[in-house]
Every structure is written in structure tokens, then in C-alpha cells.
Amino acid sequence: NWDGMTDIASAIQIQKGLGATNLVAGQLGGTINIVSGAATAERSFSYKQELGSDSFLKTTFTANTGLLDNGVALSGLVAKKTWNGYVDGTWSDAYSYYFSAHKTFGNGKHTLDVNVLGAPQQHGQRDEDQIYTVEDWKSFSSSDYSSSDDFRRASPHRYGSGWGELTEEQYDYLNDNYIGHRGSTDWAHDVLFGGIMHTKQVGDMYLINTRTNYYHKPVWSLNWKWNVDEQSSLSTTFYGSKGRGGGTGPMNTRDTFMGDDGEDDYYKYFNPAEMSDGSGTIDWTQVIANN
């Protein structure tokens, strides 16, 4: 949820140890206070582009009206971040947003602030119990991998696991039939990503992940401050947060079609045409044959 807040915050305060807070209970491990709000920002508009390794790209727009003569101030941030991932198959797509509205009224004695923020994201997960590709397993004898010290240990290098390569035709088929992207999660995932992405184009490759992680838990708040007199004030805050997140994939029953006998029918999940012989750690042709 806090991705992008550094671009809109006017100050970030870090307190170590025991700290006081207006919410629920004191913080024993420390407190991070992000100071933001439309009223404190100067009038401005900014566009920022960030580039990094492995095709990292982040685009950020921010806008602030400043405090207007009528006591109104508005601030907003929208950002998009994509990354192919350091490890194979660990692509990432993410958005972040922040909107704030401020109003001063009652001869300056009352202020009202409304804030909404969130950061929907999805990324391909890595299965840490595999380090070999399909081609590796085909080349091994049973004695090779059963005696290996690296067997069933996480890969120390960039070879990922839990993904397989599709042909462009298969990729298009899955997405055209709304199978590569599963919906009914929440509005942000449906609108921004078209649902949960099980298929993904990364560079020139078309991938399918056994696990896709997704998360979105927006936070909204309403703050009212009343300056009673020079010595006293009253602050009232209403806030809430509701979201959805987790990990899912084509091997979960929630995202597979049921066969005629009541069992999961993975064959219906994929294009019945020939599967790809491309690299990856899952032999999808054999998965289909076994199911």
C-alpha cells in the first residue's frame, strides 16, 4: 500500500523504540510517520520516469493544487511499475495511487481531510524446491539427481522455477478465451490487469506461471480537526481498509475447470493444440497427458 508514498510525502519521520500513536496501541519496535496531505503541498505538477536492470520501468505522475483561496486543496499520485524479474518467470506488474482532498471552513477553526491510497500488484512466484529446467531433468539419470547435494534446494542463480513457455498461438488462445486471466477478484485487478494473470509476455517469451501472487488492500480515511480555542483542539478520525490477496495458479481448483467425472481437468485449461517445447521447469505437455 505504501509504494509511491515517498513521491507524495512532505516528510517521513522514523522513531526507534517505544513510540506513541493515535491508533489502538503504542508501538514497541518503532514508528514510521509519513506526513502527507493536500494542504501542505505547494502547487505543482511532476512527471518522473525511472529505469533499471531487467527491464525495470516506473512512471509516476503527481499533481498538487496547493491551498486555494476558498480553502480547498487537492493532491494526487498515479504510478505504474513493471519488471521482467531478476529470476526467470518472476515478472512484476504494479500500480500505486494516492488521492487527498482538504477543506478549511468555519473561519479557519475546522479542517476536513479525505485520503485514499492503494497499490494493486501482481507478480510471478518462484518455487524454491526446483532448480532444474525440463531439459535438465530429461538429461539426468536417476543416480544423477538423487545423489546431488543441490537436489530440491533453491537455485542460487537466476534460473527460476514454476513456469513454462507457451507458443504465441497458445498464449493468444488462453487470453482470448478469458482463461489466461481469471477475474472476480476485486475491481482494481479486473480493471488494471484483466483479472489474475496466469499468462504473461516477458520480452520475446510467452510464459505461464504455476503460481501468481496478487494483492490490493486500499486504505481510506476521513480526518476532522476542530480548533476549539488557542489552548485546545479536537481531532476525529474515521478510517478503514479492505482488500484481497494471495497466490493462485492453473493448478489450483479455484482456477481450473471441472471434468465430467468431477475431477480437475487441466486439459480444458490449455489449448488442446500441441504444447511448446520451450524452456521452463514445468513440462505442460506431460501435465496435460497425465490429466
Q: Which residues fall in each region the model found?
A:
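Flexible glycine-/small-residue-rich
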Residues: K16, S36-A38
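Non-catalytic regulatory/gating segments with a bias toward low-complexity or hydrophobic composition
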Residues: A11-Q13, I32-I34, T236
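Flexible glycine-rich, low-complexity coil/linker segments exposed to the extracellular/periplasmic environment
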Residues: S141-M205, D261-N291
